[in-house]
Amino acid sequence: MARALADLSVNLQVPRVVPSPDSDSDTDLEDPSPRRSAGGLHRSQVIHSGHFMVSSPHSDSLTRRRDQEGPVGLADFGPRSIDPTLTRLFECLSLAYSGKLVSPKWKNFKGLKLLCRDKIRLNNAIWRAWYIQYVQRRKSPVCGFVTPLQGSEADEHRKPEAVVLEGNYWKRRIEVVMREYHKWRIYYKKRLRKSSREGDFLAPKQVEGGWPPPERWCEQLFSSVVPVLLGGSEEEPGGRQLLDLDCFLSDISDTLFTMTQPSPSSLQLPSEDAYVGNADMIQPDLTPLQPSLDDFMEISDFFTNYRPPQTPTSSNFPEPPSFGPMADSLFSGGILGPEMPSPASASSSSGMTPLSGNTRLQARNSCSGPLDPSTFPSSEFLLPEDPKTKMPPAPVPTPLLPYPGPVKVHGLEPCTPSPFPTMAPPPALLSEEPLFSARFPFTTVPPAPGVSTLPAPTTFVPTPQPGPGPGPVPFPVDHLPHGYLEPVFGPHFTVPQGVQPRCKPCSPPPGGRKASPPTLTSATASPTATATARDNNPCLTQLLRAAKPEQVLEPSTVPSTLLRPPESPDAVPEIPRVRAFYPPIPAPTPPRPPPGPATLAPPRSLVVPKAERLSPPASSGSERRPSGDLNSIQPPGALSVHLSPPQTVLSRGRVDNNKMENRRITHISAEQKRRFNIKLGFDTLHGLVSTLSAQPSLKVSKATTLQKTAEYILMLQQERAAMQEEAQQLRDEIEELNAAINLCQQQLPATGVPITHQRFDQMRDMFDDYVRTRTLHNWKFWVFSILIRPLFESFNGMVSTASLHSLRQTSLAWLDQYCSLPALRPTVLNSLRQLSTSTSILTDPSLVPEQATRAVTEGPLGRPL
């Protein structure tokens, strides 16, 4: 049964139909005042309001309307007039309903805060609507009822299910929402009482002499909002008993919905509002639609997609156009940028130890030709040299960070420079700056006792060689402490080797600052790195050479190990390893000037995050043999750190690679699904075709299966055609039989069972005998027989006595056809004409009795004598 919804009008004071001592009292006799006794006779005779009556329907906390109507005069004691319509009810209430009503039984209107008298009026209105519809057979203007017995009304009897849209259009049933709302209200009431005991700002204000009793301030708090629930001091005694709290005070053991909802912001709860947490004084807002912090905590590729704003540098050198949009790398302006604070402040804020220049790192460029120092970043990525240390002269700083050219260790084939014009070398290096920015704080872990730090950087003999041909260059990342834990995200990348042309050695240009940028290299072993490790060289240089424009990114399965000298007995402390995401460099790459030595020496052990290594697969023999020109200088306490600049191009390359991988996986899955469907179809054919299912163990080829299936389908089509032809023949025979039956039925009389002529004559003889007998007693019956004979003959020919049902139907049809006045008038007129012509009733009426007796004894009845 659908639930009727009632909405009280704003003004319940309606004009009285007739002046009355109590205009709104339909069934109320609670006040035995003298002014009510006058209308007692009228009130006791008629039940005014309807079907449902109670003794005290007005025991509510609201003010009675009769107290607001003013004094009662003598004119108010007139007789009451009952309004049989629902007009007066509509003046008091506005009634709406949804669905269909079935019965007029009492309805509690659960979920609606209605006064008892309003519930009585609504139920009486529904009862009167039922009475109007089913008893008075009139259409009710209020609501309609259905009887769920048969037909389409059975579907209309179903309970309507409402849904509520929450959040991002999430549908839930209205019952669940109502239940949750009730629990929410009770939950906040309990929380309010708990907060009041603790004395927070949500509790009501204190009164003199301490806190008032809880029921008293709760009554003051909620009496204006829920007057029926708590009421006031003026509430009548029977008021609380009339309220049904079953729906409101429901079970609140499950507070899942209320506990998981995000709490409103502190800005929405001003401290001066003492009752802002009260559920009766606030309404649900749009807080569930606000973004939640949990939505951002499950983004695994947060750092890969992070692109900080580009930091302006002090370099005035132009960059190649191909590297213009890629200058906003992860560490741009943040690792060794000009805006960095002092080393002491940076190390204290970021937890890093700035590298001091105590040890030189000499590297050599393997490519020669027109070198363009301006294509490399300014000295913000380069550590300053120690003026106290004497190193071989190198003309230009080593540009390993932003646009690294191909670097080759002695004995290995070099890479080729890009044909960019040579420009002036960069100015002097900046002052000493910390290695990492405070944007990425790393913790400095002091070395444990008995644990030695990494050795000093290795000095490489410069042997620059020219070589044409651009290509993408991977960023080498080596030499991190052993045991850095790799996070699950961020795969290893392997760069395919490219064509390595022969290059002629060239001499480096004279003059220039001697500095080498730090290069972080991972500890994943490659053949060259393994050979270097055998020669006791802890600092490894990754091969940078020309390759294809696309870089194939392969997950590395080699575990990361620390490449340190075999004779080093000390272990490196196990520190969690952080993987850095470095993007690939698209072709072409700018040339590199010959590197110069730089000094990298921290005062204590430096915790460096584990960086991603892009290791090219070593396949040539020259790459497998160790580099013989690698000489190491390993002072204790020195850490060789090589920084390779991150570029955001890797994320784009990895996105493209992920798209290709996803496309490949999708293609493979689609192909597998297609083949599985084909196999499933052939298995189904084996089960359907009788010639194949008869021999399940016999392996049949797909061509044979298709041929047998085609033959089987042809046979089924022939059988179906034969069956359709047979069915058509049967339909034709059925039509012929129906036509014959209809022809026979048309020959039957329309009045029912035919009466034989013999039976008709027998009935006429019985009628004549009866007329003769009755005429001998009274001659007037003969006159009556003349009038009734045509009706008797029509009755004898039309009425059937096969069954009581047919007798009833034929008798009613005979009455309608022959006994109506239009049919009786000509029949009686003909009978009177016959009587006038056959007797002397018009000339000598005294002779009529004798003529009647002679007619029944001598001549045929009804015939003229």
UniProtKB/Swiss-Prot annotation:
Domain of life: Eukaryota
Gene Ontology process terms (BP): cellular response to glucose stimulus; energy homeostasis; fatty acid homeostasis; glucose homeostasis; glucose mediated signaling pathway; lipid biosynthetic process; negative regulation of DNA-templated transcription; negative regulation of oxidative phosphorylation
InterPro entries linked to this entry: bHLH_dom, HLH_DNA-bd_sf, Max-like/E-box_TFs
Database matches in Pfam families: HLH (PF00010)
Biased composition regions of type Polar residues, renumbered to the chain: 351-368
Region (Leucine-zipper) location: 716-737
Residues in bHLH domain copies: 662-716
Start and end residues of each stretch annotated as Disordered: 15-41, 53-77, 334-392, 500-653
Molecular function GO terms recorded: carbohydrate response element binding; DNA binding; DNA-binding transcription activator activity; DNA-binding transcription activator activity, RNA polymerase II-specific; DNA-binding transcription factor activity; DNA-binding transcription factor activity, RNA polymerase II-specific; DNA-binding transcription factor binding; DNA-binding transcription repressor activity, RNA polymerase II-specific
Modified residues (Phosphothreonine): T27
PTM per Swiss-Prot/TrEMBL: Phosphorylation at Ser-568 by AMPK inactivates the DNA-binding activity.
Subunit structure, interactors included: Binds DNA as a heterodimer with TCFL4/MLX.
Protein name according to UniProt: Carbohydrate-responsive element-binding protein
Organism encoding this protein: Rattus norvegicus
Lineage, opening ranks: Eukaryota, Metazoa, Chordata, Craniata, Vertebrata
